[in-house]
Amino acid sequence: MSEGKKRSRGGLAIISPPKRRSQRKSTSDSPIPEPIMKRSITVKKIMPRKTLAAIVNTGSQSTPKVSNVPPAPRRSSRISPKIQKENAFSEQSQIVHKDVPGQSSAPKINVLSPIPVNIQLSPKQDNRDIIMSQKVRRSYSRLEMSLNSSSSLYSPTRKTDSSDTSTPNVVLKSGRSSLFGFDKLLNSEMPDGELKKSNGVTRKKNTKERILGTVLPEQPDHNIPGVVLAKQKRRKRKVAIIEKSDLDEWAAFMNAEFEEAEKFDLTVE
C-alpha cells in the first residue's frame, strides 16, 4: 500500500475518464433557441401593356361613387397569396380613391412602355386624299361596268367621255375586254388587210404542226464570231413508193373481209 501511494505522489497520476451524462439531463442545460421572426412579403402582378392600356381607357370614364359602404376585409399574404395577386390592382385603385376624394380624375399608372397611351388611331385625312379615294373607287366601278356591260353602252365611236380617270370604257364588238389602249400599238405597224393575212398564215401553220405532231427544230445561227461550226451532212431518207395497183388490191381484200364479217351470224346461248 505504501508503494502505490508513493507512485501516485511521484507525478505520474492516473487520470480517470469523465462521466457521461444522460440526454435527458443534457437537454435541460442547453440554451433556449431564439423565436423565428415572420416577415410579410408583398407580391405584385406584372400586367401586360395591352391590358394596362385597356384599363386606363375604361378608368377614365366617370363612374358614380357609392357612399356608406364598408370596405372588403383584406386577407394576409400567408393565407391566400393567389387572391392577392389577382386583386392587387383593384385594391390599389380603391386606396387611391379613398386618399383623394375630391378629385374625379382616373388614377395615374406608370406604364413601362415607349408607346404613349393616348394615341390617335384614325388621323384626320386631307380633303385631297378623300377626293382621290373617291376617284379611285369610281374608276374601278366604271371598269367593271365596261367589262360586264354590252358594247352598245360604251361604243368605240363615242367621242364624249365623262370619266375623270385613265381607265378606258371601250368594249370590243367580239365581247372581249380591251387592252387598255395598247391594241392601237399592235395595229399601227401594218394595215388591217395584211394583219388578217398574217393571222391566217399562222393559223394554217399551227394546224399543220398539230396534225403532224412534230415541230421542226430551229436552225442554228452560223454567224457567231470566233466559233467555227462544222457542217453536218444529213442523208435523206428514201421513202418506198407504193403503186396504185397495189393499193387497189389491198382495198379489195379489206372490203371482202368486212363483207364476210357482216354476213357472220353470232349466236349467244
Swiss-Prot record:
Q: Where is this region: C-terminal Sororin domain?
A: 247-269
Q: Which Pfam families match?
A: Sororin_C, Sororin_middle
Provide one Gene Ontology cellular component: cytoplasm
Biased amino acid composition, Polar residues = 57-66
Subcellular locations according to the entry: Nucleus; Chromosome; Cytoplasm
- Motif FGF motif per record, residues: 180-182
Q: Which InterPro entries match?
A: Sororin (IPR018605)
Swiss-Prot/TrEMBL domain comment: The KEN box is required for the association with the APC/C complex.
Family the entry assigns:
Belongs to the sororin family.
Protein name per Swiss-Prot or TrEMBL: Sororin
Source species of the chain: Xenopus laevis (African clawed frog)
Traced from the root, the source organism's taxonomic lineage reads: Eukaryota, Metazoa, Chordata, Craniata, Vertebrata
This protein's gene is called: cdca5-a
